[in-house]
From Swiss-Prot:
Record-given protein name: Probable malate:quinone oxidoreductase
Top-level EC class as recorded in UniProt: oxidoreductase
Co-factor requirement: FAD
Keywords on record: FAD, Flavoprotein, Oxidoreductase, Tricarboxylic acid cycle
Disulphides: none
Family to which this protein belongs: Belongs to the MQO family.
EC number(s) on file: 1.1.5.4
Gene Ontology terms describing biological process: tricarboxylic acid cycle
Pathway: Carbohydrate metabolism; tricarboxylic acid cycle; oxaloacetate from (S)-malate (quinone route): step 1/1
Length: 506
């Protein structure tokens, strides 16, 4: 079927991709502007089948409680907590939106998507223990990190983390920053609930439909070309606003849109693999998200973690990540993704990163060369008695790190997310990876503020119902923080008192 004969339909909003970002934006728009029509196109046959799938996530529930890359050490030995506070502030916004969703019926059964799990930072060696003590000293007095503990006694370590203690040589000092109030989030389950609400309230979701092109019209609207991957039928959709929440596929579509704001951006794909525990007895001996410290010179994405996941109400355990490399921008993408993303406007950025990120290149080479025995040996830093027969290697989702123009360098690699939008607010997209899904709500509120400045003011009362702290830094208003924390904990059923230590089985 030719494009000329394609069926044409009209909609107010097109969401590209059925992942957590599109689902969040759609759920917000259905509440603040219920008269707008919303159409979602997903190239695969299921919701959240790429990066939002729980086994494809590199990490979940990111709130900077345990991730050491958010708390770098200064030259004088002190620890900078700026990034950690910023990430935690964003996660509090997401928690509030989810709690409001449960209260209002947008979401149901919070246990299906969020569960209390301690977040733990783990190091060994005297110098690293000293750093972790300095990190604790910097964070423990901050209202968003209240309740954090510093643990360096072997007997307490053993009580809380029995799987990690068995066979460990405690003559090498160990230290933990332990936060009881952490969470595990199944973003696949959450995405399904949010998109279920969008569909039930009048939105339309098309699976097996791939957006192939975006063309701006003189009236400011967009012609969106879509192909049904099952039968090859093409259709044309006219939309007043387009959000490209296509994960690794977002860069290509933003490039096709031709907007000036997307020029100069590139993407560097990194695939991830994890060891997933297959022994229920071992899974029952560990209930925590334990994050270590990346090796000197290794990128932030390489931070090792032994991670409890709760998926379908069942506990799971994984360790990683082990980096891999593929030119695909999506797990189910194409090998031409990377080469076809190189354009005249981002060529210098891409080449600049090739020169400036030699450390990343070396890291990837070493990871690709690692044997199965080498992976188990790495795991033994966390689980000294680990045996290969108890673990299986799984491939996680593709992460496409943002490459951005930089004066004098050509381009720099950024380990975060970036909202890209046209100046007229008719199209926006999200690029990048970590912290990703955990900050979906503040990211989508940012999209609304950028793209709908006139409507945003009239939407504010409704948005403040969803997020009571909207526009307020909770760090600066401890009374409000206490109020929303108690509220979200109750509504989301996050009773951490029942999680006495990591040896308690789920």
């Amino acid at each position: 079927m030719s494009d000329q004969n394609a069926v044409e339909t009209r909609t107010d909003v097109v969401l590209v991709g059925a992942g957590i970002m599109s689902a969040t934006l759609g759920a917000i728009l259905r509440q603040v502007q219920p008269d707008w029509s919303i159409t979602t196109f997903e190239r695969l046959d299921a919701v959240a089948a790429e990066s939002s799938d729980p086994w494809n996530n590199a990490g979940t529930g990111h709130s900077a409680l345990c991730e050491l890359n958010y708390t770098p050490q200064n030259a004088d030995g002190t620890v900078d907590i700026t990034k950690a506070v910023n990430v935690n502030e964003q996660f509090q916004v997401s928690r509030q939106f989810w709690a409001h969703g449960v209260e209002s019926g947008v979401l149901t059964q919070p246990k299906e998507f969020i569960n209390p799990i301690p977040h733990v930072s783990f190091v060994h060696g005297e110098a690293n223990a000293k750093y972790l003590r300095a990190r604790y000293d910097a964070l423990a007095g901050h209202p968003l990190f209240a309740g954090m503990e510093y643990i360096d006694a072997p007997d307490e370590f053993t009580r809380r983390l029995p799987l990690m203690a068995k066979g460990r040589d405690f003559s090498d000092p160990v230290a933990l920053n332990w936060t009881q109030d952490g969470t595990d989030v199944d973003f696949g389950a959450l995405t399904k609930q949010l998109l279920g609400y969008v569909g039930a309230s009048g939105g339309v979701v098309h699976f097996g439909h791939e957006v192939t092109d975006l063309t701006k019209q003189s009236d400011g609207s967009w012609v969106v070309k879509v192909t049904n991957r099952r039968n090859g039928v093409k259709k044309v959709v006219r939309a007043k606003f387009v959000f490209v929440g296509a994960g690794g596929g977002a860069l290509h579509l933003l490039q096709k849109s031709g907007i000036e704001e997307a020029k100069g951006f590139g993407g560097f794909p990194v695939s991830g693999a994890f060891l997933r525990c297959t022994n229920p007895e071992l899974i029952d001996q560990h209930r925590a998200k334990v994050y270590g410290k990346a090796a000197v010179g290794a990128p932030p994405m390489s931070v090792p973690h032994l991670d409890t996941r709760v998926i379908g109400n069942k506990p799971g355990l994984l360790f990683g990540p082990y980096a891999g490399w593929s030119p695909k921008f999506l797990k189910q993408g194409r090998v031409t993704d990377l080469p076809s993303s190189v354009k005249p406007d981002n060529l210098l950025s891409m080449l600049g990163v090739g020169v400036s990120e030699l450390g990343l290149v070396k890291y990837l080479i070493s990871e690709l060369a690692m044997s199965e025995a080498g992976r188990i040996e790495t795991l033994r830093e966390f689980v000294p008695k680990a045996l290969g027969k108890d673990w299986e290697l799984i491939t996680a989702g593709q992460r496409v790190q943002v490459i951005r123009r930089a004066k004098g360098k050509g381009g720099v690699l950024e380990f975060g997310t970036a909202v890209v939008n046209a100046a007229d607010g008719t199209i926006a997209g999200l690029l990048g990876a970590s912290p990703g899904a955990s900050t979906a709500v503040p990211a989508m509120l940012d999209v609304l503020q950028r793209c709908f400045p006139a409507q945003y003011e009239s939407w504010k009362p409704k948005l403040q119902e969803m997020v009571p702290s909207l526009g307020v830094k909770l760090s600066d208003d401890t009374a409000l923080f206490s109020q929303v924390w108690d509220w979200t904990s109750k509504v989301l059923q996050l009773d951490t008192s029942k999680v006495e230590d990591a040896s308690v089985a789920v």
